[in-house]
Amino acid sequence: MLTNSLALALLPLTLTLANPLPAPAPADTITIANAGISAADTVPNSYIIVYKSTANDGQIKKYHGEILAKLGKKPVAEFNINGFKAANVVTDAAGLAKVGKNDLIDYIEKDAYVSVSPTTNNTKIFSGPSAQSLVQQPSATWGLGRISHKLRGYFNYIYDTSACQNTRTYVLDTGILIGHSEFQGRAVWGANFIAGSPNTDEHGHGTHCAGTVAGANVGVCKKGTVVAVKVLSKTGSGTYAGIIAGMQWALNDAYARGMQKRSVFSMSLGGSYSSSVNAAVASVVGYGIPVVVAAGNSNLNAASFSPASAPSAITVGASDFWDYRASFSNWGPGLDVFAPGVTILSSWFTCNTCYYYLDGTSQATPHVAGLAAYLIAKEGLSTPTAIVNRIVSLSTKNQVVNALTSPNRIAYNGNGN
């Protein structure tokens, strides 16, 4: 593992010594857990310090006081998610060397960029006087048809009338155009972690994903609520620290509303492998809320990406209309299920009646997040373990072509033939 160290400059000796002096002891080194990450992927001079599970709040507060004394500034963010305790410190390598050695620290990571999973098919924008004029049930999207039938090729969506009623799906993304006609008042603004940005979607990705979760015509959940948690900018990018902050806020919000057993996190985003992001996901799941994440669009093993590699997450790959694994979809034994992710029509951010086609594991993920909320409402499932087990047991087996080492499952709600 690479390490960062401070170089010591020694003045040249002018004396000639018969026996050379021993080399000076090296300066304290700070081990960085993800030191091998590409420099292009890292947020300059930003680190996530993760504390040991034994560190208590008083000890951490004292340590943060030491950071203030040594650096002249406090951590820019502090995290406490069900035993996952961490801080985001902005400083250079010299500053990190001053504060990065403490018995409370479990590990330190470089903060890094995350982004929406890139999409490959932006074919057409639709607009009309109302959502009803665009698509009506039973004339549903092929994705809704696929997750409600054992066989491919259907365009009618079969679902229970509970339809995710009294559930909240937190969409951690670029925000949501909450006034879009698809949501019928069931989209609400939650929190914004992009400094200086407005409380709306400036990119489109979040609105598209939210529509697949809860759109009246293009969504899984006809009666469910989606909550905008803006952690990605108008360029579709964000940071590890911002993602963790968004998860912490959403968890606290769900508990404050007494909705922790009726909530789901949908995270169609990703970056390089991160122990801290995966640990934060595990903490949210440990607190009783399922976290559904995109496998990623690099046609690589999802184990190299986060949060896709988080063992406690429900990791979703993308399949197409013909049940082939999408050519871009990440794969591997860490996936839980595939879902429709090619040529997916959903709500768009440019107007309240606009729609757009996108491809990606980002589009597959909200199908499964919606399914998780659907099962909470329909079957009364109340734990992440029960939800993922039910998704796996219901799934259509051995239909994905070229699943590689992934579990061969397609998401299914248990209704149509």
Identify the role of each PLM range.
Residues 139-140, 156-189, 197-242, 258-264, ...:
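Subtilisin-like serine protease catalytic core
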Residues 21-39, 53-55, 65-143:
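Autoinhibitory propeptides
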Residues 47-50, 88, 107-109, 168-172, ...:
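Structural recognition of the beta-strand scaffold that forms the well-ordered cores
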Residues 1-24:
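Fungal secretory targeting signals
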Residues 210-214, 222-234, 248, 252-253, ...:
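Hydrolase catalytic cores
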Residues 52-57, 92, 113-114, 175-178, ...:
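Acidic glycine-/aspartate-rich tracts in secreted/extracellular proteins
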Residues 110, 247, 257-350, 389-395:
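Catalytic-core segments of hydrolase enzymes
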Residues 134-137, 154-162, 200-202, 293-313, ...:
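Active-site-adjacent substrate-recognition loops and nearby beta-strands
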